[in-house]
Amino acid sequence: MGEINNNKEINEKDDEINNKRLKYEGFIKKEKKKKQKIDHSIPLKEKPTQEDIDSHSECLFWIVNKKKHRAEFCKYKRAKDSILCNHHKPIDQISSEPQPQLTDYNGDDVTENNNNSTTTTTATTQDDNSKPKERKRIHCPLNPTHIIYECKLQKHLKACPNAKVGQKNAHIELSKKEPYYKENINDLNENVKLTLEPIILSQVSTENLINISIKLDQFFEKFFKNEIQSLNQTHKSFDKIFNSDQQLKHIQQESSIINLLENSNLYNSDNVYLEFGAGSGKLSNHIFMSHEKKSGHILIDRMKFRSLKKVDRLIKNEKGCHHFSRLLIDIRHLNLSNLSILEEKPFVITSKHLCGCATDFTLDSIFNLLNNSNEKVNNNFKGIGIATCCHHICNFNTYSNQSYLKDQLNITPLEFQLICSISSWATIDENKCNNDDDDNEVEEDDELIKKDKKEKKEFENQLKIEFNKQDVFSIKRKEELGYKAKRLIDYGRYLFIKEKLNLPNTKFWIYTNQSKENLFLVSNK
């Protein structure tokens, strides 16, 4: 027994020593990675000395980088019969050179034999005399400092940093050529259009704020006599699919949405799920996984996400996926009638946190689809499940139910704009009203998306912070009014779904307690 205890003590000491060593090594690595301070007082070498030239065996092109305060030789290998690499050789000297030929270890051409064909994988095209063709090198048309093979021009242009600015919006232009594109088809064209600016709450008088707060209380009591039902339960597939704490909050919200879809008979592996405002498509992936990878999906978003390839591949490359497509298009211009798959498969409209007027465009797109399609499409349409958010960026011109504002609320367009602004108060936090709200999180993997989110957040914070300077309401009262404003905006959408889309079985649900953006509109036929 004594020997066993001694061995345990030795092992524990060894583990402790190893842990300390690993921590120390990690610390050293971090210290090495830290940027060294640049001493700009030391003059840069404009030209190399003969000693520098003699000691350098690679390309002898001298690079002076004033930004990094560094001067050094290029580190690429020299080209054949030259003191420079192919990148730095004059273009007239490298305009043509033989294309390399791939060989195996026996010196033979590398080929792949398939059942139906033989494909040569050599990097050269040979003529009758078995002489490799020459590849021409040219300047990049976007940046003359880039020298590339002419045969690889198109590939280079896709990755060229100078092309990225134009590429950010290229998909928007390309979408105009698609059969499902129709200019402003979902722009609620029957609406009254007025010239209205967003209302800044700091510019609203105390009297107007008090008057609109009284109306909000009255309307909320009228339309929401009973509390909105809450179903904050994860789906049965949750524990089987996810076993980590990474982004647990969002995963739980998605699981709760799936649970509500199932309870509303909108959950079936035969369905094609159209996710509006899909972002990187995590809700669709969660639905797909919960169906044991046996469902169809159409992801719709006007943004182009770098990370979309990750989630998209998780769905479309599976054998059980009976349909997949991603539509890079603004919902305002999406003509669902030209999606042929909707005639072939039952489909459900879904979304998690569909921002502002995008919800209204989505409802209008469904209205246009059901009124302009054949009986097959109408029969295949099973229902809607939409989680709304960002009511503060809604506006009168694009609101889906203007008749509700006029006939039931009896408010003016300006009063509606004020209600939209007040809805931003729902997400005020007493301790950190300036901090970003993770509940409306989108994948920030593209500069365009970062800019779009930043502008939206600046506008939201302006509405939150720049309230009337007399501080008419307490923080708690503001949150209450903001919540009521959101629900009244959603109530008009609820009536639109029931009356215009002819879906009387429409319900409100509170689907999460982890976010103040927590309302889910669900309806089935």
UniProtKB/Swiss-Prot annotation:
Q: Which domain of life is it from?
A: Eukaryota
Q: Which InterPro entries match?
A: Methyltransferase_TRM13, Trm13, TRM13/UPF0224_CHHC_Znf_dom, Znf_CCCH-type_TRM13
Zn-finger (CHHC U11-48K-type) intervals are 137-164
Check the UniProt entry and state the signal peptide residues, or none.
none
The yes or no answer to whether the keyword Secreted is present is no
Family assignment? Answer: Belongs to the methyltransferase TRM13 family.
Source organism phylogeny: Eukaryota, Amoebozoa, Evosea, Eumycetozoa, Dictyostelia
Task: Report which residue ranges the record marks as coiled coil.
Answer: 440-469
PANTHER family (UniProt xref): TRNA:M(4)X MODIFICATION ENZYME TRM13 HOMOLOG (PTHR12998:SF0)
Q: What is this protein called?
A: tRNA:m(4)X modification enzyme TRM13 homolog
Kindly give the Pfam families that the UniProt entry links to this protein: TRM13, zf-TRM13_CCCH, zf-U11-48K
Give me the reactions it catalyses: cytidine(4) in tRNA(Pro) + S-adenosyl-L-methionine = 2'-O-methylcytidine(4) in tRNA(Pro) + S-adenosyl-L-homocysteine + H(+); cytidine(4) in tRNA(Gly)(GCC) + S-adenosyl-L-methionine = 2'-O-methylcytidine(4) in tRNA(Gly)(GCC) + S-adenosyl-L-homocysteine + H(+); adenosine(4) in tRNA(His) + S-adenosyl-L-methionine = 2'-O-methyladenosine(4) in tRNA(His) + S-adenosyl-L-homocysteine + H(+)
For bias type Low complexity, the affected ranges are 112-127
Q: What biological function has been recorded for the protein in this entry?
A: tRNA methylase which 2'-O-methylates cytidine(4) in tRNA(Pro) and tRNA(Gly)(GCC), and adenosine(4) in tRNA(His).
Q: Indicate which residues the UniProt annotation says bind Zn(2+).
A: C140, H146, H156, C160
- According to the UniProt record, what class of enzyme is this? transferase
Residue ranges annotated as compositionally biased, kind Basic and acidic residues, are 38-50
| EC nos | 2.1.1.225
